């Protein structure tokens, strides 16, 4: 679903949100059919992340080499000399890019916020009110057998706007699922727990290669959620070399058993995760 950024008028007092994608009728992120909103920004830089462009506050320019026809209109349009051709190959100097979008406007194979374009700026800034106007027709279609899922990135990094969105959805009785790494402060989780029907708890960094320093904090967050009778679905990505090891799985099993979490979701690793690294110019960390 393409979310259209709209000019904010004086009557719209709702909070602004940054997001990079919206999926309608998803069946993988909560019960039933879901409208899934992918929010921009993440405090965790997982080696296996398949959306590295979601991590910064604003996503970098994505370049799909296979969709480029070599017309060179971007070269003429960009005053910062971001685009250049060397021996027929389209190269991008990302350090000079100010994300103005002029190159996208001139590219015949690009639309500013559409995946698959030759050039693409994924991050969209929109108010909560404007976002709801665009997604609510889909929510009404699926409200009896689905709901809304807030994913990312890490949605709760935009706390004030997320609270406004959650409060509206709660008032409308839409089922609300929220995905998190569990690495934010317990105070943040305490503020929104009454508004969330299901926590999709991504076990991204606990134990294993980089997780030791985070173990105690994740345990504290789980303790707090369990005490508030929150419904939690732990989700474990089966990443080769990280979460498919016996020692890691045993540690996770002990943690889940300690908190009486008897149902887990083992998510298959996205083998095509390298696509967004290629398009964003962000170096891959996986060995």
Go through the PLM ranges and name each one.
Residues 1-75, 80, 85, 97, ...:
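Flexible, acidic/Gly-rich N-terminal and inter-domain linker regions that tether
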Residues 6-14, 113-115, 208, 213:
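Intrinsically disordered, low-complexity coil segments
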Residues 55-194:
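Conserved Radical SAM active-site core
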Residues 61, 65, 74, 197-198, ...:
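Short alpha-helix boundary/capping motifs
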Residues 129-278:
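Conserved AdoMet/S-adenosylmethionine-binding subsite of the radical SAM
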Residues 277-287:
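A structural motif corresponding to the C-terminal lobe/cap of the Radical SAM core domain
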């Amino acid at each position: 679903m393409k979310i259209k950024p709209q000019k904010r008028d004086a009557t719209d007092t709702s909070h602004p949100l940054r997001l990079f994608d919206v999926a309608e009728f998803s069946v993988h992120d909560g019960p039933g059919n879901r409208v899934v909103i992918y929010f921009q920004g993440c405090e965790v830089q997982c080696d296996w992340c398949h959306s590295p462009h979601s991590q910064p506050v604003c996503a970098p320019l994505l370049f799909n080499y296979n969709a480029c026809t070599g017309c060179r209109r971007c070269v003429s349009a960009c005053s910062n000399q971001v685009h250049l051709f060397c021996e027929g190959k389209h190269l991008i100097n990302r350090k000079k890019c100010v994300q103005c979008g002029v190159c996208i406007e001139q590219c015949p194979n690009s639309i500013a916020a559409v995946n698959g374009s030759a050039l693409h700026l994924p991050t969209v800034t929109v108010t909560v009110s404007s976002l709801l106007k665009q997604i609510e027709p889909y929510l009404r279609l699926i409200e009896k057998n689905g709901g809304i899922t807030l994913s990312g990135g890490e949605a709760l990094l935009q706390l004030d706007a997320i609270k406004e969105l959650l409060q509206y959805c709660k008032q409308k009785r839409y089922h609300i699922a929220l995905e998190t790494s569990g690495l934010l402060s317990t105070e943040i989780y305490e503020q929104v727990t009454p508004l969330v029907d299901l926590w999709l708890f991504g076990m991204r960094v606990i134990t294993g290669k980089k997780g030791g320093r985070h173990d105690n904090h994740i345990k504290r967050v789980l303790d707090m959620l369990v005490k508030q009778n929150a419904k939690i679905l732990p989700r474990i990505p089966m990443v080769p070399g990280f979460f498919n090891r016996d020692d890691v799985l045993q540690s996770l099993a002990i943690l889940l058993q300690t908190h009486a979490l008897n149902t887990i979701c083992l998510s298959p690793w996205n083998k095509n995760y390298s696509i967004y690294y290629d398009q964003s110019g962000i170096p891959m960390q996986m060995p």
